């Protein structure tokens, strides 16, 4: 509730009386009247921990609190009618994640679709939350939209980005780092910024792209949304595949003609807390890496399958790139560079060191063959 105050009108109390037989009516009336006055002075508490995204109707519904109250009520927010009541039970002392002693409430049997809040017998309450079969739809769309906000090398337009719109960034990606043994410029614009910095890392893309494509491959009917308000929305292609393709196009730029894949494109130092379009300075392409190449081969092989029915030309491009990367791994049976990737002197951006590339090679083989 916005103000933290619950408005339970007197007619609601009278309505509740209908659930009580006449013999107990007076007792129940005064009990509900007391409850009514308690709710007038109830406040929303940060100590009542719910799933604010909501709960699916037929799945477990648990909340936690650090308040040692006796009981809890689940109240429908639009009517202030009590829909469920039960006792709290002890959950854990000194919870390792929070350091708190926690109590839990279980209202899994409440399956009616609606908006509710938890009210504790001590007067604390939760924020409002929904029970609905679509509670995860919004979570999915916002999660997917997060990748759009990470796009590098392009304008984020206000109709799509809202208050997060900004000019194009990092048009100069990138220059070969001296450690590559090469010199000059190689176009590696595009892709997604990584986490909290503006670097772009192939091995990090492996888990992200691989997971997103696996989700679509496993449950295509669950990821066919084409209305996430990204520039490609409405083109008949699931937005998930459109967004992943933006990253795949960058990854293709990171492959050398010999099939090997460069490890990352970053500055030597992490940038400060600035907008991406204000991040100037040279961004370097770092050495060929067998862990990057293995991830790349696996991603491209999986992409070739999923995009085949959408764009056969792009699908074939992905498959050819995956095959070329695999051939590089065969020609280089031990880890490249020797001992695994290490940042060169003067570079402190993400290293993601790995001295064993057997898992990347296995994944690549599984996707290709």
Model segments located where?
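Bacterial Sec-dependent N-terminal signal peptides
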Residues: 1-47
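Ligand-binding face of N-terminal immunoglobulin V-set domains in extracellular IgSF glycoproteins
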Residues: 48-77, 82-133
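Well-ordered alpha-helical scaffold segments within catalytic/enzyme domains
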Residues: 63, 120, 209-232, 247-254, ...
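Aromatic- and glycine-enriched glycan-recognition loops and surfaces
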Residues: 105-110, 193-203, 229-249, 281-291, ...
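An acidic-aromatic substrate-binding cleft motif
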Residues: 125-202, 207
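Long, well-ordered core segments of solenoidal/helical folds
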Residues: 134-157, 243-259, 319-338
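Glycine- and aromatic-rich loop/turn segments at beta-sheet edges
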Residues: 162, 180-195, 221-227, 254-282, ...
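Catalytic cores of eukaryotic secretory-pathway lumenal/extracellular enzymes that build
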Residues: 266-267, 283-309, 315-318, 325-369
């Amino acid at each position: 509730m916005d103000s933290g105050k619950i408005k339970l009108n007197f007619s609601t109390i009278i309505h509740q009386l209908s659930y009580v037989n006449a013999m107990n009516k007076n007792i129940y009336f005064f009990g509900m009247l007391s409850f009514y006055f308690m709710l007038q002075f109830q406040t929303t508490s940060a100590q009542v921990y719910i799933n604010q995204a909501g709960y699916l109707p037929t799945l477990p519904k648990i909340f936690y609190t650090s308040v040692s109250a006796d009981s809890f009520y689940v109240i429908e927010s639009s009517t202030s009618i009590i829909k469920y009541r039960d006792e709290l039970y002890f959950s854990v002392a000194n919870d390792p994640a929070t350091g708190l002693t926690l109590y839990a409430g279980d209202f899994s049997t409440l399956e009616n679709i609606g908006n509710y809040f938890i009210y504790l017998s001590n007067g604390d309450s939760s924020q409002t939350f929904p029970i609905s079969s679509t509670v995860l739809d919004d979570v999915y769309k916002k999660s997917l939209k997060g990748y759009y906000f990470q796009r590098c090398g392009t304008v984020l337009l206000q109709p799509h980005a809202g208050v997060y719109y900004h000019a194009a960034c990092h048009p100069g990606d990138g220059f070969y780092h001296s450690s590559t043994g090469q010199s000059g410029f190689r176009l590696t614009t595009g892709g997604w910024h990584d986490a909290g910095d503006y670097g772009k890392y192939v091995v990090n893309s492996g888990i992200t792209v691989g997971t997103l494509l696996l989700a679509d491959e496993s449950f295509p009917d669950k990821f066919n949304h084409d209305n996430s308000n990204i520039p490609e929305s409405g083109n008949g292609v699931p937005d998930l595949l459109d967004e992943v393709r933006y990253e795949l196009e960058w990854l293709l730029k990171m492959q050398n003609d010999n099939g090997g894949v460069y490890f990352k494109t970053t500055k030597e130092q992490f940038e400060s807390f600035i907008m991406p379009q204000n991040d100037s300075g040279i961004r370097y392409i770092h050495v060929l890496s067998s862990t990057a190449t293995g991830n790349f081969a696996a991603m491209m092989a999986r992409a070739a399958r999923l995009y085949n029915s959408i764009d056969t030309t792009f699908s074939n491009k992905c498959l050819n790139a995956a095959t070329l990367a695999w051939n590089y791994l065969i020609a280089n049976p031990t880890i490249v560079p020797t001992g695994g990737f290490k940042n060169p002197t003067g570079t402190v951006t993400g290293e993601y060191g790995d001295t064993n590339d057997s898992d990347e090679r296995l994944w690549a083989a599984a996707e290709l063959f």
